[in-house]
């Protein structure tokens, strides 16, 4: 027996060998992942962007699953093709004079899920590099093949994959569901040993993540040995994220799942581009292109920069502005967003990788996954609104271990300087937003039932147990399950007479299948949970295709109208066959396109840090450059009112010619503020009928009453957590009147609480919890629904739900249906279900999504409870404070044209700046013309004279203004107008009803002709 000293050295692991060829050494977290994979364990890997997560999982997979080398038999998950190829390989022999056939490729072993199909090509390239190099020395890996399958995959490659899938397949959740819908799905997918969910944080919190959970449960049923690994860089609730990923594998596997956190020394720099002259009275987006010269200077000092913006319209504006400022950068400056043609996007991505581009103005289309090593720096125009998004974008620079990442925030209004300081503090504290899986989305479950019926069929009891393994459907009641089965079987009670909705039926053996080939093709064409507005192709007349734009915008343009798209000024020629034909315009003022969508709300984590920064300013501590820069605004706010702190709730009251104002600053985010504002207005109307206008932003809300209100006395009643009983129809409750074209459509309707109707199991579809203390939330939901036009909001939500559930047939590949057609179809179903099928689960889901997503009821309730623990500070104002001013501008936007709004803002700015310049004496000076004090003075004539003098409206001219003063005011209005055109699109895209200024501008329509019951 040889002595220990004479034994041969243990061979180095395969992964270390490959890293050594690159001159790299593995990080400890990579070794930990390799050990877990070798043991067949699943888990979640969390590490900073660019730390080497891909190599950690991929090299571990090659070590664990790439050395078996034998063909699997049927009992081991081998396919018929594997066995046939193995037989052919063994049939020939040298004695027969025939050359032995090469061994067959390994079957599908690794599924790599990416959230964006645009990332598939880059991911595949990253996986192929070590695979090809290791295959030269590892015979078993030589039989591994690789490929991608997404919506962009060509027909030839799809055909080849239909005959044999590659060993490692990079795909999307939608394409995985398509594979599950194949009749031979079990034979194809039962060989999978590893599923990787890349960028798990992007999937976890939405329906695509639920789609992944259901698919994993299906795969685990076919192969209990399958491993699942998730990768993420920006998650705040790691144990919950791991459980959501691993729960579909079974309780035992989930309990043994590992959580690996990569600790890599990587420097992150978060700084801010400070404005030269920050304004004391700011509103969303008002800085606009004033920061353009500073941005251009920053771009001049770096070789390659990504300029991130939050919306596509803002990307078009900034790209054009930078190119106008530096026309010599043509060819070095590019634009990238999801509406551009795929060829354009790929050209931009290639230019970034090769270092040919100086800068790219982009949206979230470049947030994820793609490695652009030449990128040195990232600029973020406007607030990122969340820490996770900030970290994700920062990681696009220095995307490699050991290289620093730098992101520079460019504020679009003065208060975003406070957000910038708060964001840096949150990053230093290691705080990141949490993400949770949606609860029981019925539309996704209905779609999955049809998919599984296509993929070999299912037995209801077995599938029910399988579905309940997922976190999303862990508490799925039996009654809801039976409703879903009935819905896919016969369409429910209201669609029972229509064959198109009788999609799934049990066969003689009790297996539920989809017998109609036509309905099968229709379902496969519309699998997925991504719902977007109908779009049109934009194509140069007799030229190239530029991309797509939403039909709602293009349909409003007439021939000859100009608009900006793909960084060019285009002129509309005609619209034909859902294609907008354009030509490049030589002149004309272009319209900036708008894409439908909601404004991104400020995350609760970032909002808490903003309040902490304000508390430091209130204590006189201006430690950061951002706070020192914005100090003039904060000083005026503190002198005229107060600064919010974590322990106080600031309320401001003001009397103007418009009425009686209440400003509140809960810092709960835009969505929660919409619900709070409507709730407070409804409560105020219960004691006395009134007319209210509402405005909201991320910091606070405004209520404006046309009749006198003692807001200070009303506040305790408005801010209570426990709800009062909802008045029944016909009661003596005071109505809440709304002016035409004003505010949120708030209605005192007792039947709005119908969303709380209970299903046959006795459980509310809208989660209220089971503990007695959650009764407050249940009652609050009734009150919130009673205060809102919940029906209209639910109708808009229902369109998306109906599409996912398969009620609306969007199109066959290559076809397009207009938004009007889709909207008409969804509205018809909505009205029919409300009339004939009030217990329809899809209707209830629409109500629940309105509460949980559009109004963020959970955050609303949390805000009310936090308010109860705070000291209420009520500050009467003589004029709008710096915090109140942007709320007033939000409200003005909803009823004034750009011209009128610019004049109004310029006049108010002149008055407020004059008062602010007066220093401490301003509080005692007469208020400006737009403001009437709570107690009118005894000598109004002197008051009006002082107001005229302050605004320059005394002497000469039609309006009484002196020529010089009038010219100055006109110049100020023009300056405001230039930034206003930008700010109206820079804040966020329009289109989500209540998002822009806090009210819904959509009008109720008469119900369409109901579908007859046969």
Residue ranges, per PLM feature:
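Intrinsically disordered, low-complexity domain-flanking/linker segments in eukaryotic proteins
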Residues: 70-105, 729, 733-759, 763
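Helicase motor core with emphasis on the C-terminal RecA-like subdomain
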Residues: 7-8, 20, 25-31, 38-51, ...
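Short beta-strand-centered aromatic/proline hotspots
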Residues: 568-575
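Short, well-ordered loop/turn sites that connect or cap secondary structure elements
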Residues: 530-532, 557, 564
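A conserved acidic, glycine/proline-rich C-terminal tail/linker
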Residues: 543-561
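Short amphipathic alpha-helical interface segments
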Residues: 447-458, 534-542, 916-922
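Short, solvent-exposed secondary-structure boundary/capping segments
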Residues: 576-593
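Extended, highly charged accessory segments
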Residues: 464-535, 549-550, 593-594, 601-748, ...
């Amino acid at each position: 027996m040889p002595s220990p000293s004479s034994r041969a050295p243990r061979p180095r692991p395969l992964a270390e060998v490959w890293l050594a060829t690159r001159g790299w050494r593995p990080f400890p977290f990579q070794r930990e992942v390799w050990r877990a994979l070798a043991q067949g364990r699943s888990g979640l890997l969390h590490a900073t962007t660019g730390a080497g997560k891909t190599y950690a999982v991929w090299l571990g997979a090659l070590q664990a699953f790439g050395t078996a080398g034998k063909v699997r038999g049927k009992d081991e998950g081998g396919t018929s093709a594997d066995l046939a190829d193995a037989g052919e390989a063994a049939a020939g022999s040298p004695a027969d004079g025939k050359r032995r056939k090469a061994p067959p490729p390994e079957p599908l072993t690794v599924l790599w899920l990416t959230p964006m199909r645009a990332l598939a090509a880059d991911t595949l390239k990253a996986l192929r590099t070590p695979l090809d190099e290791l295959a030269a020395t590892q015979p078993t890996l030589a039989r591994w093949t690789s490929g991608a399958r997404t919506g962009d995959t060509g027909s030839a490659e799809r055909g080849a994959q239909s005959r044999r899938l590659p060993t490692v397949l990079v795909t999307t959740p939608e394409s995985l569901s398509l594979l599950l819908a194949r009749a031979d799905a079990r034979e194809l997918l039962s060989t999978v040993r590893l599923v990787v969910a890349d960028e798990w944080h992007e999937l976890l919190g939405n329906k695509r993540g639920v789609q992944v959970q259901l698919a994993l449960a299906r795969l685990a049923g076919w192969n209990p040995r399958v491993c699942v690994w998730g990768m993420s860089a920006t998650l705040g609730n790691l144990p919950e994220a791991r459980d959501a990923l691993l729960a579909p594998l079974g309780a035992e596997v989930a309990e043994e799942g590992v959580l690996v956190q990569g600790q890599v020394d990587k420097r992150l720099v978060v700084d801010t581009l400070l404005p030269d002259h920050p304004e004391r009275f700011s509103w969303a987006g008002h800085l606009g292109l004033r920061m353009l010269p500073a941005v251009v200077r920053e771009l001049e000092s770096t070789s390659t920069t990504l300029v991130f913006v939050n919306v596509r319209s803002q990307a078009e504006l900034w790209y054009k502005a930078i190119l106008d400022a530096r026309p010599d950068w043509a060819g070095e400056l590019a634009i990238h967003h999801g509406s551009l043609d795929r060829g354009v996007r790929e050209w931009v991505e290639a230019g970034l990788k090769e270092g040919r581009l100086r800068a790219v103005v982009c949206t979230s289309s470049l947030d994820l996954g793609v490695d652009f090593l030449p990128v040195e720096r990232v600029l973020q125009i406007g607030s990122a609104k969340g820490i996770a998004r900030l970290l994700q974008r920062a990681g696009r620079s220095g995307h490699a271990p050991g290289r620093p990442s730098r992101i520079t925030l460019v504020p679009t209004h003065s208060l975003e300087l406070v957000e910038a300081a708060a964001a840096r503090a949150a990053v230093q504290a290691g705080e990141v937003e949490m993400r949770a899986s949606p609860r029981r989305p019925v539309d996704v479950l209905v779609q999955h039932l049809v998919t599984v019926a296509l993929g070999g069929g299912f037995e209801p009891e077995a599938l029910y147990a399988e579905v309940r393994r997922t976190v999303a459907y862990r508490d799925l009641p039996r009654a809801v399950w039976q409703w879903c089965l009935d819905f896919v079987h016969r369409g429910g009670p209201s669609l029972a007479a229509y064959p198109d909705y009788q999609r799934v039926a049990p066969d003689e053996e009790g297996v539920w299948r989809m017998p109609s080939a036509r309905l099968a093709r229709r379902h496969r064409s519309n699998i997925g949970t991504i719902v977007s507005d109908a779009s049109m192709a934009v194509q140069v007349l007799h030229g190239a295709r530029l991309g797509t734009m939403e039909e709602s915008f293009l349909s409003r343009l007439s021939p000859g109208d100009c608009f900006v798209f793909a960084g060019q000024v285009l002129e509309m020629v005609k619209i034909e066959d859902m294609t907008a034909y354009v030509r490049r315009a030589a002149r004309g003022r272009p319209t900036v396109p708008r894409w439908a969508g909601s404004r991104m709300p400020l995350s609760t984590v970032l909002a808490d840090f903003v309040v902490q920064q304000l508390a430091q300013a209130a204590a006189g501590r201006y430690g950061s450059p951002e706070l020192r820069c914005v100090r003039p605004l904060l000083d005026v706010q503190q002198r005229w009112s107060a600064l919010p702190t974590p322990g106080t709730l600031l309320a401001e009251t003001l009397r103007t010619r418009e009425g009686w104002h209440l400003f509140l600053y809960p810092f709960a985010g835009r969505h929660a503020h919409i619900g709070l504002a409507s709730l407070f207005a409804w409560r105020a109307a219960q004691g006395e009928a009134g007319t209210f206008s509402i405005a909201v932003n991320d910091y606070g809300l405004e209520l404006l009453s046309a009749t006198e209100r003692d807001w200070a006395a009303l506040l305790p009643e408005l801010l209570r957590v426990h709800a009062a009983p909802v008045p029944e129809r016909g009661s003596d409750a005071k109505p809440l009147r709304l002016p035409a074209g004003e505010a949120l459509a708030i209605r005192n309707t007792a039947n709005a609480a119908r969303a709380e109707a209970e299903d046959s199991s006795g459980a509310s579809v809208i989660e209220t919890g089971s503990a007695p203390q959650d009764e407050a939330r249940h009652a609050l939901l009734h009150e919130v629904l009673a205060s809102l036009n919940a029906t209209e909001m639910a109708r808009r939500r229902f369109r998306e739900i109906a599409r996912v559930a398969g009620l609306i047939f969007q199109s066959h590949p290559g076809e397009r249906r207009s938004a009007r057609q889709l909207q008409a179809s969804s509205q018809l179903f909505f009205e029919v279900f409300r009339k004939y099928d009030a217990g329809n689960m899809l209707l209830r889901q629409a109500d629940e999504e309105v509460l949980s997503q559009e109004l963020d009821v959970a955050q609303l309730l949390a805000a009310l409870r936090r308010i109860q623990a705070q000291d209420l500070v009520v500050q009467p104002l003589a004029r709008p404070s710096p915090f109140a001013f942007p709320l007033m501008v939000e409200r003005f936007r909803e009823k004034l044209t750009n011209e009128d709004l610019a004049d109004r803002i310029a006049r108010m700015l002149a008055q407020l700046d004059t008062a602010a310049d007066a220093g401490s004496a301003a509080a005692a000076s007469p208020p400006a013309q737009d403001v009437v004090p709570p107690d009118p003075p005894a000598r109004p004539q002197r008051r009006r004279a002082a107001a005229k003098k302050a605004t320059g409206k005394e002497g000469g001219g039609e309006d009484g203004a002196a020529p010089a003063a009038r010219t100055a005011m006109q110049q100020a209005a023009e300056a405001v107008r230039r930034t206003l055109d930008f700010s109206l699109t820079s804040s966020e895209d329009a289109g989500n009803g209540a998002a822009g200024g806090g009210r819904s501008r959509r009008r109720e329509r008469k119900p369409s002709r109901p579908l007859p019951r046969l």
